[in-house]
């Protein structure tokens, strides 16, 4: 199967066997084995009503199993029975379709080195700092889409003990599983559900959170609002962007300390896995809709990413975020990722008659590994894969559809991509899957033999370093174009990390240019080394990463929008 209106990874996932999908890091994402359904992202033409009518007409027997989550600007998340995915993609109204990708958090004296103090005057309640313009984020929403929040932490509460959180959408808590603390007029018990227009998780309003905070015991609080931040990542990020420092008498106060908060905990009910891009897109849509309801400008913080894609800014996720950054009074901030020193990117320029060997070290106990090669379609290259024991497959045929090989105790799944409306570059995708539990360790080699070269540039990416074992990576990596997606989006404010103690960029910080488009990224850097911020339980913890750098800029953007009365056009 090969459909040019579907991305390569989705084409391959539909062609892969169930065993191959289960063994792969990426191919299974978005597939529900029990229901035999796929979650996909689409860009379509027309209205939601027209799309629903089209599905009812074309797929009457399956219509009750089709779920549409409509996003702004003609994007949607669809849940489709497996056997109609390709048929839906072939519809004239569907412009392009992608599968979800996993997202990984970018974790590896912030306020002072960010020059925030000079913009604020602090009252005696939270200590005295040098006076400035007294910007605090008032009237500008800070939205954090992350691992959740400890809503009981003093830094996210007002002086009277009430919450600063306008709404909390926990995508991991099934709808209708939490009783509404405010009984219906007839006295019957009702249950909290997903936000209007969405099917995922449970939404908690400010009133519900305040009712939970009124309770005297932790058990009573979490019975009313059971949302927790297990990893502490989202709590830490929110504290940097907008914590008010009440638990530390102002010592660890965040940037936009009076901004109202919107919180989305990413995830899927019942799954213990990384969040997906489909959940992120719904979260962004939700936050902007809420900002419009409240009539306030909004800054959205994204402190995670992934490595799948051409890194050129043209995937549906990146295009969607670019569109949303121009919608309402919205700024979107993303960390550049922590792949700068993780050996997951290699690049070079091929010349005719000169063979290029790219070596990849694979450590022991690696359950699977995938590799993307991105090149110009006009370049003809013979590609071979060489096992650590010297056996090889290739040169592989440049044909559409999956190709399968076995080297040692490792199965190889290969897919050659073709042109598509959202991908003008060619992808060659290798998925190394274990015959038993682990793929073969040692040094693998990708051999590139130029046949006919027009441009010659190539880039290779492995998965984000956070999911690889230590020691797995390219032996000759490139530190450039190590941005994670979606920080490659053109209109997203991309933030790298620097070390404020030594006044230099952090080695782990992802960096550009973006591939082919050559856009300079990150747009700016912020403190990202040894940053102290909020931790679940009411205290503080120190962390490093571009996850910690991005919220400094998120808070700073809120101050700027407060100063400019939310006039995003003038501020740009």
Task: List each language-model region with its residue ranges.
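Autoinhibitory N-terminal propeptides
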Residues: 1-76, 83-131, 161, 269
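C-terminal subdomain of the subtilisin-like protease fold in secreted/lumenal serine endopeptidases
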Residues: 27-30, 293, 297-306, 328-330, ...
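Subtilisin-like serine protease catalytic core
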Residues: 128-278, 295, 329, 367-369, ...
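Active-site glycine-centered loops adjacent to acidic/histidine catalytic or metal-binding residues
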Residues: 146, 337, 545
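Active-site-adjacent substrate-recognition loops and nearby beta-strands
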Residues: 157, 308-318, 339-376, 380-402, ...
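Substrate-binding/charge-relay-adjacent region of secreted/lumenal peptidase catalytic domains
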Residues: 173-176, 194, 202, 206-207, ...
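Hydrolase catalytic cores
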Residues: 238-241, 249, 262-270, 288-298, ...
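Short acidic, glycine-rich surface-loop motifs adjacent to enzyme active sites
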Residues: 264-266, 284-312, 335-336, 447-451, ...
